Amino acid sequence: MNGTARFWALAVTLTGMVIGMSGCNQLLARDQLNKGCDAFKAGHYDEAIEHFQKATELDPKLPMAKTYLGKALEQDVAPGVTTPENLKIANQAIDIFKEVLAQRPDDVNSMKEIAGIYFSINDMDNAESWQKKVLEVDPNDPDAAYTIGVIDWKRAHQNKLNALQAAGINDDGKGNVKAPKNVMEPLAQQNAPLIDEGLKYLTMAVNDRPNYDDAMQYLNLIYRNKADVDYGNAAAVTEDLAQADQWTAKAMDTRKANEAKKNQGPGGITIDNSGQMH
């Protein structure tokens, strides 16, 4: 066999070995993925993380492996905790979901996961930004619209508490009409854009999901903050509070209807809180 023939024979042999190793790695990766899923379902998140990491190393193109890894990491993120260790885990999970988006730019679920992680570590700017990315892909997503409305309410409410507490005033939840102008007028200017946006997105959420009782409850809350923005306009304040009361009542009725539907058994049988069938 001449040199050229030997070269091609060796090349074919090596190619076969590489293909064989690649196929073996794919099988091993799927095995690690399955083990990770089992650990995740059992609540063993650290073990699941190890399996999902091995799966992605063995087969970087394995569908869902990185998504599952991001979800497992997310379980270790403590909501509301901003310690360096917790933020490190949160950012690891976020980076994994961003890697998924690099391969699938319109993966709305990864966008939602990123937004949710940012929300859980109180990074509201990024949480809102990513929820708006969700709405760019799916304009009718009620949860994204709801979350943006909640963020706007949280900001406006905190602004109000800061202003009132600095003046030694307790929030009355009814527009604080007795508070002085030098407190309420600057607050109204500060909060007006937040209230407008919050109302817009919470209304979108309810329109897209008519039984969204949580969004209805936040409409109640944001109308109460709108009463502060309408300081000095008695008719507007009265209307804001009436709207708040209406949304409270609607939220309660809708929640009851949702619970009744949840407890409804086959054939229209309803199970009450005591377990009795009707």
Task: Name the predicted role of every residue range.
Residues 60, 105, 139-140, 210, ...:
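Short coil turns that delineate tetratricopeptide repeat
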Residues 20-23:
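C-terminal motif of bacterial Sec signal peptides marking the signal peptidase cleavage site
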